[in-house]
Amino acid sequence: MSDPTRGPILVLGAGAWGTALSVHLARRAQPNMVSLWARDAALAERMAHNRVNSRYLPEIPFPEALLVWASLEDALASWRSRVAGQDGLGLLVLATPVSGLRPLAEAIAKALGPPKDREAVLWLSKGLAVTPEGLLWPNDLVAGPLVSWPRGALTGPSFAQEVARGLPCALTLASTDPVFARQAARACHGGSMRVYASGDLVGAQLGGAMKNVLAIAAGVADGLALGANARAALITRGLAETARLGQSLGAQPQTFLGLATLGDLILTSTGDLSRNRRVGIALAKGQPLAEILSGLGHVAEGVSTAPAIRSLGQAHGVSLPIVQAVCQLLSGSASVAMVLQELLDRDPVDEDPSAHP
């Protein structure tokens, strides 16, 4: 059943997650109210003809209501026209790795200019970018070209394959504007997907970035067969590192116990579908990083995010030993055995993150 309060939604990026979200939203939408654009024009043409994304989700047929675009300009123009003719909030959803956010936002700004009534932008990306201007969060990358657009992050524990299959999940819609967060959450909420609103964009973005780095550490522990105790310790102490850094950034403490941090951390650190965890498992087995990434077939954001998070921690004087360990493994500056021993040999400290770094 369609939701009359939901406006047109255009998902920009036909990877696994962008496709899965499009399929989910289109199952409950009126025809052509949910659209999917693919950067690869040949892929878009195949998807439009075969009604499936054979590259990323070959077993998931597209709902009849889903419209596929090969031209970004045409997709954006059609979306704007449909927003003007419908009630409800119209959403552009940027489903690209962090590295692609700014170019895509710039293309949107060039094609559409300032937002019109009931137009807004979301992103699915999780990470922290190293740029000539410094370390930039997804919000920074999007806000540059789209400064006047209402915007926010849709984040939380969500394996694309499970969302595409219609299995239940719960996500967070975070924005610096709590009112917009609630509006956008309602626009995405429904069916097998629950969406909660949050006004803590800082904490939500940090949680999404940190969990990818910590999942690499959890994967290393699993690859070494260190046991469930070690995995639980890494997840818990990794959460403590996230909370310490979040406190220095002004995030709300409760965010780190929610879906955007703890929920996503548990999923990514334990699930077999986690790309970052698979990177850690392969590192533990001695596989070179370049070989791991070439065989992955998808972007593992934790690889590029780890050194950025380490730099952020150093800038704020926050100790992040697990993040540091992951960086050493990724750079090849230390062996797995050496990194593990360094973590175990650290002096005992108070567990309360406010009592000791």
Question: Model-derived features: where do they sit?
Answer:
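Internal alpha-helical scaffold of NAD(P)-dependent oxidoreductase catalytic cores
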Residues: L21, A111-L112, L141-R151, P168-T255
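NAD(P)-dependent Rossmann-like dehydrogenase/reductase catalytic/cofactor-binding core
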Residues: A218-D222, Q247-P357
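Rossmann-like NAD(P)(H) cofactor-binding subdomain of soluble oxidoreductases
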Residues: V68-D74, Q86-P168, A184-R186
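NAD(P)+-binding Rossmann beta1-loop-alpha1 motif at the extreme N-terminus of oxidoreductases
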Residues: M1-I60, L67-E73, W79, V83-L89
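Short, conserved active-site loop motifs that form the nucleotide-linked donor/cofactor pocket
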Residues: A65-L67, M193
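Generic structural signal for well-ordered, non-membrane alpha-helical segments
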Residues: A14, G18, D40, L101, ...
